[in-house]
A protein has these predicted regions:
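H-loop/switch region of ABC-family ATPase nucleotide-binding domains
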Residues: 68-69
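Catalytic Walker B motif of ABC-type/P-loop ATPase nucleotide-binding domains
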Residues: 33-36
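ABC-family nucleotide-binding domains
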Residues: 43
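Conserved ABC ATPase signature
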Residues: 8-12
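ABC ATPase nucleotide-binding domains
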Residues: 100-133
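H-loop (His-switch) and adjacent beta-strand-loop-beta switch element
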Residues: 81-94
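Helical segment within the ABC ATPase nucleotide-binding domain
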Residues: 48-60
Length: 133
């Protein structure tokens, strides 16, 4: 958004509009962020940049409650996941303490054809990755 300060909001792309709305929400410094698909309309880089920023805000003591539909993003950036279907909570996942077996069992309640595996990046950090079967 750098350099777009005087640009009319209505002329921005959908992704730029989403970033503006989220920036305004984050700057308000509310103790609780309620976010409905904050990653919608964002490209890959901005999606992960935004999620990392939300993660940093939470680590500073604020709370974020998000509705997201990507199991990959949920596993990477969320501490706790509520798995919902038709407005009913089917199960919860703690991404820090639940084993892969438990996560896969719980994810199968919503997603039939995925498997969560662990992999290590070049910096030797372990990530949980969703693989379609």
């Amino acid at each position: 958004l750098k350099g777009l300060y005087e640009t009319d909001f209505l002329t921005l792309s959908e992704g730029q509009k989403q970033l503006c709305i989220l920036a305004r929400t984050i700057i308000e410094a509310a103790p609780l962020l309620l976010l409905d698909e904050p990653d919608s309309a964002l490209d890959f880089s901005n999606r992960h940049l935004l999620m990392q920023h939300i993660r940093n805000i939470v680590s500073d003591g604020r709370c974020a409650l998000m509705c997201i539909h990507s199991p990959e993003l949920a596993l990477e950036y969320c501490d706790n996941i509520l798995l919902m279907k038709s407005g009913t909570i089917l199960s919860t996942i703690n991404t820090h303490t639940d084993s892969l077996d438990i996560i896969n069992e719980k994810m199968s309640l919503i997603y039939d054809n995925i498997n969560v595996i662990e992999c290590t990046d070049i910096n030797h950090k372990t990530h949980r990755v969703v693989v379609a079967l």
